[in-house]
Amino acid sequence: MNKTLVILFSINIVTSQPVLEEFYYGDVDRQYYLYIPTTIEPESPLVFVFHGFTSSAENIMEYSGMNEIAETNGFAVCYPQGTTDNNGNTFFNVGYSFHWNQTVDDVGFIIALAEHLQAHYNLSPINTFSTGMSNGGEMSYLLACEFPNYFRAVAPVAGTMMESWYNTCNPEYPTPIFEIHGTNDNVTWWEGDPQDLGGWGPYVGIDDIIQLWRTINLTETVVYDTLLDINLADG
């Protein structure tokens, strides 16, 4: 697919074995992988990486390459594991129509986990970031809407914003956005799906999402960059 990068704000920001950890929140035992570089300074950044629908923390850790980047640049990476819905699919609760009866509080879980990791590993509370693929990208947008004071910037990949919370997204603080999306994405459509033809629930098109964050961030200009599809087999 053709891929377009949208930058609303410029940010600058293997050898250690990732460890599967457990964290109890909301009467549920949650799991996550944590990667700490072999050498890391106090108050280093923390990056959350969220997997997609039906995927796993281990899977996105393996294919994202974030551990190698963290090792080189000196930041911690956390890969939270979603819970399982009634059909046995792993997910983060962002409001899909078929998850209307799911009560898991993923936002609360991530905020509590961030505070735990910041305190336990002496990581920076003001340099916490989020990215994710598809459902994980939507989780990043949701966190930016609801807890912008916790996340310095977010970088959703192939994600969108559900209409149910797009219409109420009015954060107190601006959040830099690095939006990555395929213009021919046949799962999460670039133009959105307000009629819910795809069955996920009504969601917003990428152009509308960018316009929303331009307004929130008081951004006068948006930088678009288009990349060629160099791997036709990657979906």
What kind of feature is each model-predicted range?
Residues 15-46, 58-64, 69-73, 102, ...:
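A domain-start/cap signature at the N-terminus of enzymes
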Residues 152-235:
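The feature captures the conserved acid-bearing segment of alpha/beta-hydrolase catalytic domains
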Residues 54-56:
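Serine-hydrolase catalytic-loop signature spanning alpha/beta hydrolases and amidase-signature enzymes
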Residues 81-105:
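Cap/lid segment of the alpha/beta-hydrolase catalytic domain
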Residues 49-52, 79, 179-180:
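Structural cue for short, hydrophobic secondary-structure segments
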Residues 108-126:
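Conserved acidic catalytic loop of the alpha/beta-hydrolase fold
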Residues 2-16:
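Sec-dependent N-terminal signal peptides
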